Amino acid sequence: MLRKNLKFPQRVLAALGLSALLASSAFATPKVVIISLDGATPRLIKAYEDAHQIPTGTGFEILKDKGTLALQNITVTPSLTAVAHIALATGSNPSPNDINTNTFQLVASPFTKTISGFGAPIGGYVFNPLGEDPNPTARPLWHALKAAGKTVVTATWAGGDGVDVKVPGLDNSPIIQPAALRTVDFTVPFGEFGGLSAQGFALTKADFTPLPTPKLRGQLIAAGHPSYSEILQKRTPLQTFKVGGVSYTIQVVAIDSTDDGVTNYDTLVFYDVAQGVQPGPFQLPSTGPAYVKFSSGMSAPFYLEGSSNKAGLGYFVSALSSDLSTVHIVQYAADDIPRNPAVIADVDDINTHVGFWADQADFRIPERISPGLSQFSDQELEAAFEDQVRLFVDYQTRVALRAMERFPDADLLMIYIEQPDGSEHQFLLTDQRQATNPTDPNSIYTSQDPAKIARYQGYTLNAYLTANRAVDNIIKAVGLDENGVPKADVFVVSDHGFDPFFTSVSGANILAKGGFDTSKVRAVTSGPDVNFYINLQGREPNGTVTPQEYITLQQQIVQYVQSLNDTNPLFTLGQQTVPVFEIVHPRPVDINDPNFGLETDSFIGQDAGDVVAVLTDGYNFDGVQSPLVNRKGDPQDSKAILSVSNFYGAHGFNSQILDMSAIFYAAGPDILHGTLDLVHNIDVAPTIDKILGVQPDDTVQGTVINGLLK
């Protein structure tokens, strides 16, 4: 993101930065590299390969041609991102590793609090007395590797964050999992919201006026950005906000970068009034002003100088008339890398060598959840989303290559790439029951919008091509031998597959329709999965439900959710009824057990709900609109359980469904060439241990993949 020479556009510098990292990291080779492509789905990759849309000699094609491909990789249930990544890292299922959804409640926390599955204690904790478990029921594979003297690097992998985990909402909570268990030799946490949400600005020429003083013109010339028409400045500041303890006043000016004798404004310049337009060069994470040339179709980064969290954002211009009659600007959300004390040196290394945390694809923009976007066309907002797809995967790739540069001979490098998941959620519009206009329930079947479907198919393809480029760049950094085989053992996996969904399900309305008291029962949802928690005395702080009432409530929840059926023939495809839930699993209970309410089994972990339920494929708790939009053919009901969704793709369903299969590729010195019919994602960790000659942790449930290793 550094503009080392301000005459170079940002996209060129990003490419140069990536090339430099590729060159510098190619001289040494890690032993094992695992790359997780969130949401990559075997059937979609095969379709793109069959259509010759994946470039030969790159990424997926190298791995398939020189190594092993599995036709099916059964992940865990629920097939959610945090759940599956912790399963990959531990080689254990969600019950023992205690991460059962992306968001859930620690039973030690107050009844209204939740924790992210990405930051929850792996393998559980001691409930009474509350504290760290010296013998957790699952450990990440880096625990055994580091004990054996191996070098491990995690680049935004779930669980590798250097966090001291505490119980949310509990005053004076002890550390229930120390940072040491979540820290490796080089640990890069996944980024976080920096304090300013995305928003749009729709301006016209009336919003601009000539510069009041010539000072800024001189600054722009000094910075290498002269204007060949009169510089126009917004009459009032574009925005003011506070991030990381610092207040910012952002102004925007329009310049004409073409020396053609015609007034045609083509570039917007964003700067902080307190900083002015500085000429540079800038040292990362600093960027100076953001210069956005509309014709590039790309955003520009903007570092928030002085912010305590080292945050930054971006500006994207989605529409710009040469006479400024239409000016549409999308300000991306501010983001940063968490400054966790245990890994602060690694965080600063990324900030100063790669840049501040880039903007990942933000669904709030195309769904118009972010303010100020009502005048923007769908295509404008989709263009902003696609820009973020490119931007963020490029950033994650450079983070991975920087990690490789720091530890070129690491024994294990674990890399996470967010695409194609984000795009599939937004654009997997492939089912005739999906409303192409979320506000119009009639836009299904023959009333779907074919142009929108075609655009969305292109965006999904682009996500896979972008992910493939990331894989290819990392493989090329590892290096290929004379036979074209990667010099390291490279695993490319995903956490889950993907399917379209056509109906949103309201957890809140399930409780209301079922007559449940929300002070006693709550529903914590993640995708198509829900944990129903009961506010049990002696378990939750200030719990109110007696053990006897708990048993009654648990039975009522099970009976009610099992009774929910979809009877609308437009959505049941010829069946009279379709159960809304495929899996409904209660926590085992024994009224005489001193650990009543903490019992576990092969599906229910310590912090899972008292009833865990998984929706039938095609239904999803996410996507409920406000106000709710009733489906075509359903009764008009503002509190309906089933409704029209505002996006299209989902995962988290039963992992035995073929479409939920993750991908699995492997190639390298220790990998055979061939095809495997079936692998399991919990087998990846012990297979890596085998390659590195380390005995797996005794909590590992997976086994070495048969037929993979030489």
Region annotations inferred by a language model:
Residues F127-Q379, F392, Q396-M414, E418-P438:
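A contiguous, mid-domain pocket- or channel-lining segment that forms the substrate-recognition surface
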Residues G59, A463-N509, T572-P588, N592-P594, ...:
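Metal-dependent active-site segment of extracytoplasmic phospho-/sulfohydrolases and closely related
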Residues P30-I45, I62-K64, L88, L145, ...:
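Beta-strand elements within well-structured catalytic alpha/beta cores of enzymes
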Residues T137-R139, A202, D207-T326, A333-A334, ...:
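Active-site neighborhoods of enzymes that stabilize oxyanions during catalysis
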